[in-house]
């Protein structure tokens, strides 16, 4: 019996015949094959994404992108693995009552290598971020091992739920989006992930220390294109869940105040499912046919530009732009760092009134609210062996 995917390809070719000697048709076949491999199916003559209400289906959409990223990193990964792996704890090295987190800014090649290696561990590949970027490692001072990592970067320009929560008009947003950063990487690594370390990392991203480092890093700096020097007041973080509704950020409160506030969901459109080795082909094709969108990249337009690139390519290839609808509705969170964050971002107040959120106070709250109760009822972390996350082994197994 023939593979179901082969039968689907036959049906698709009958709908839109493919000349394999034409570059456009070869690219069209490549894109369709990639979608089929990620779980898209043919319904009433249309390719539709897998059911996004099932988190396993969502993970399947990411499988090929993650595999591609591992393969791209192969030679680098093998060159650094033995250097970075000892900085991941074995379960026996974790003393729950003596954990003490320390924040470290990524400012060296070794730290960058450790950050990159750790981010490749997750089942959902992480973005490289856009524009301004600040990356952090979170260490356990007691044993010198890595707890987790996070990164802040420029936020996307178009995010309706965020803009509605703030109460932004276009002119206010253009003027004050500078004071917002997006947490595009946020999570813990094992064995700390077993101990709800992701909640700790999320809280630390909102700490006074991070906000103060932002102010120091961007003080007296002119913006890239407008050459405007602004006071670097970081008053709001945003982030989105990877797999629909988030259990990590929901109910993440400190002393009765909700730190991460859910403001809605994305609409399930994007280009990530065209990023698994095909985006460069898309860009090369558009450049070859002279589509002006290739040259339209501008500051702040990173993800939107990629979206437009893929959309234009689909149209040129005779495919529906609806293929950009992957169906994954990510939950959107805002993290106000000041009690008057919304008024400040609307231009109604000139100085932010910051919450007091020192790192050590946040950890003490996390320790008693989540860490110690979790460690008492779930001892899986104790059996963790860092060799189980050796990525070169996974790379060899996946070919």
Which role fits each region the language model picked out?
Residues 7, 14, 110-114, 278, ...:
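Alpha-helical structural motif
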Residues 32, 38, 45-55, 59, ...:
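Extended effector regions of multi-domain proteins
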Residues 15-16, 20-32, 39-40:
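Non-catalytic, regulatory and substrate/membrane-recognition segments associated with hydrolase enzymes
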Residues 102-125, 131-289:
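Acyl-donor binding region in acyl/amide transferases
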Residues 1-6, 71-75, 156-163:
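Short, mixed-charge, low-aromatic patches
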Residues 36-135, 139-143:
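Low-complexity, highly charged intrinsically disordered N-terminal segments
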Residues 1-10, 14-21:
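Solvent-exposed interaction patches of small proteins and small membrane subunits
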């Amino acid at each position: 019996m023939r593979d179901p995917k082969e039968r689907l390809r036959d049906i698709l070719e009958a709908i839109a015949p493919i000349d394999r000697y034409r570059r456009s048709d070869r690219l069209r076949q490549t894109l369709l094959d990639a979608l089929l491999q990620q779980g898209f199916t043919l319904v009433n003559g249309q390719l539709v994404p897998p059911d996004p209400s099932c988190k396993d289906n969502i993970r399947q959409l990411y499988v090929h992108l993650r595999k591609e990223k591992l393969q791209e990193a192969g030679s680098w990964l093998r060159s650094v693995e033995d250097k970075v792996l000892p900085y991941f704890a074995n379960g026996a090295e974790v003393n729950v009552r003596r954990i003490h987190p320390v924040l470290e800014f990524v400012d060296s090649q070794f730290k960058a290598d450790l950050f990159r290696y750790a981010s490749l561990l997750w089942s959902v590949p992480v973005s490289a971020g856009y524009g301004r970027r600040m990356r952090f490692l979170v260490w356990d001072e007691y044993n010198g091992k890595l707890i987790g990592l996070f990164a802040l970067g420029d936020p996307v320009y178009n995010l309706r739920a965020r803009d509605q929560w703030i109460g932004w008009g276009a002119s206010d947003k253009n003027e004050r989006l500078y004071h917002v950063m997006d947490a595009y990487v946020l999570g813990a690594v094992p064995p700390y992930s077993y101990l709800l370390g992701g909640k700790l990392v999320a809280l630390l991203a909102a700490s006074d220390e991070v906000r103060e480092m932002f102010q120091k890093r961007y003080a007296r700096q002119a913006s890239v294109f407008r050459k405007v020097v602004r006071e670097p007041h970081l008053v709001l973080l945003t982030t989105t869940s990877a797999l629909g509704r988030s259990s990590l950020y929901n109910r993440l409160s400190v002393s009765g105040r909700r730190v991460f506030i859910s403001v809605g969901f994305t609409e399930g459109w994007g280009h990530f499912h065209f990023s698994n080795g095909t985006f460069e082909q898309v860009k090369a094709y558009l450049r070859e046919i002279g589509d002006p969108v290739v040259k339209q990249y501008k500051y702040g337009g990173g993800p939107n530009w990629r979206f437009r690139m893929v959309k234009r390519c689909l149209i040129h290839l005779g495919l529906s732009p609806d293929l950009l609808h992957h169906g994954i509705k990510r939950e959107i969170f805002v993290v106000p760092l000041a009690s008057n964050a919304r008024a400040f971002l609307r231009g109604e107040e000139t100085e932010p009134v910051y919450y007091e959120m020192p790192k050590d106070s946040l950890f003490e709250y996390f320790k008693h609210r989540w860490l110690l109760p979790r460690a008492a009822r779930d001892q899986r972390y104790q059996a963790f062996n860092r060799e189980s996350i050796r990525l070169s082994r996974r790379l060899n197994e996946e070919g």
